[in-house]
């Protein structure tokens, strides 16, 4: 929304992390939404950074009206080429902001620096989007002249904000995760992608903001054990489930006060989960149709899970 009205910002470095259908009820179309996001690159002075896996981001960079001397810097999950950041033997490597980058590279961090962000602190369970975000953060920092040791320390010390893939409890070997900030299909797909097949009880739904969630449901179907559906319009989730995951059972929370909704969704999720599973509140939708905010939605979820932990204990 801010980029829509922005005209005079001149960033040192910039990046568009993702583009997925969101806020279409405000922007009117995905094309208009993409055009507003692309403005993040306008007037960039030094580095227009983009994910090599994103054709949309590459197009934004190619078409951006940047300042003279601005370079395109790519992010890769593989060995980086010149003017790229990438991964080599478990290390984040800079081949963009180093002397003689045609033959030199600089390790700026280790993937081990991100282990505390993985479920259970296990590096092998680290969600792929966290690695992508770390590459982006490292590139932005290096563009601003930050030294490698400081990049590494920053990643080690980083603590996610509230309601962002927070494990709030483990009860009877079932992890309960608050990702209430996951209000888009893209965010929820990333949150569920690293889980094993048939191991997730997904709490989903709410105000879809004009987005079609069919592709999301198709993507995450293999990991689902069951779905608890929130929202005034549960069909945003139930109709794609019927089409792409008819084998996955679901329940509908229905209507009530925010506290009643939280109590019901936690009880329904608990009835589905089995030992080793993960119950994750990652709605892919805004909260406004039933809650004051995603914060309230996540807080009430965590409170109900804590109450259940006390009962079980």
For each predicted feature, which ranges?
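Short, charged low-complexity linear motifs
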Residues: 8-22, 275-287
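Glycine-rich, charged/polar anion/phosphate-binding loops
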Residues: 1, 122, 185-189
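Inter-motif core of Ras-like GTPase G domains
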Residues: 7-18, 192, 196-202
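Short, glycine/charged-enriched secondary-structure capping and boundary segments
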Residues: 8-13, 29-32, 62-66, 87-89, ...
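Acidic, Mg2+-coordinating active-site environments of NTP-dependent enzymes
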Residues: 2, 10-175, 302
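ATP-dependent carboxylate-amine ligase
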Residues: 140-149, 153-163, 167-313
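A short, aliphatic-rich alpha-helical micro-motif
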Residues: 8, 41-42, 221, 273
């Amino acid at each position: 929304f801010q980029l829509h009205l922005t005209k005079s910002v001149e960033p040192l470095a910039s990046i568009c992390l993702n583009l997925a259908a969101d806020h279409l009820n405000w922007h009117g179309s995905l094309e208009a939404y993409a055009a507003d996001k692309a403005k993040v690159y306008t007037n960039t002075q030094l580095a227009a950074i983009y994910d090599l896996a994103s054709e949309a981001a590459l197009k934004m960079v190619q078409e951006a009206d940047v300042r003279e001397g601005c370079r395109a810097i790519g992010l890769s999950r593989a060995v980086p080429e010149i003017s790229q950041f990438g991964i080599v033997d478990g290390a984040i490597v800079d081949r963009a902001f180093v002397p003689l980058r045609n033959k030199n590279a600089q390790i700026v961090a280790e993937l081990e620096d991100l282990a505390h962000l993985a479920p259970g602190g296990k590096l092998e369970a680290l969600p792929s989007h966290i690695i992508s975000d770390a590459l982006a953060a490292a590139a932005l920092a290096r563009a601003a002249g930050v030294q490698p040791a400081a990049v590494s320390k920053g990643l080690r010390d980083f603590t996610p904000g509230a309601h962002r893939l927070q494990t709030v409890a483990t009860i009877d070997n079932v992890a309960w995760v608050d990702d209430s900030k996951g209000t888009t299909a893209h965010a929820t797909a990333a949150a569920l992608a690293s889980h094993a097949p048939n191991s997730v009880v997904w709490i989903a739904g709410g105000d879809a903001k004009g987005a079609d969630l069919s592709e999301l449901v198709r993507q995450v179907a293999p990991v689902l054990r069951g779905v608890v559906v929130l929202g005034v319009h549960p069909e945003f989730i139930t109709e794609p489930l019927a089409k792409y995951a008819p084998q996955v059972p679901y329940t509908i929370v229905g209507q009530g006060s925010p506290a009643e909704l939280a109590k019901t969704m936690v009880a329904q999720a608990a009835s589905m989960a089995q030992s080793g599973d993960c119950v994750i509140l990652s709605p892919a939708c805004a909260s406004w149709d039933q809650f004051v905010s995603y914060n309230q939605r996540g807080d009430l979820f965590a409170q109900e899970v804590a109450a259940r932990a006390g009962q079980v204990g």
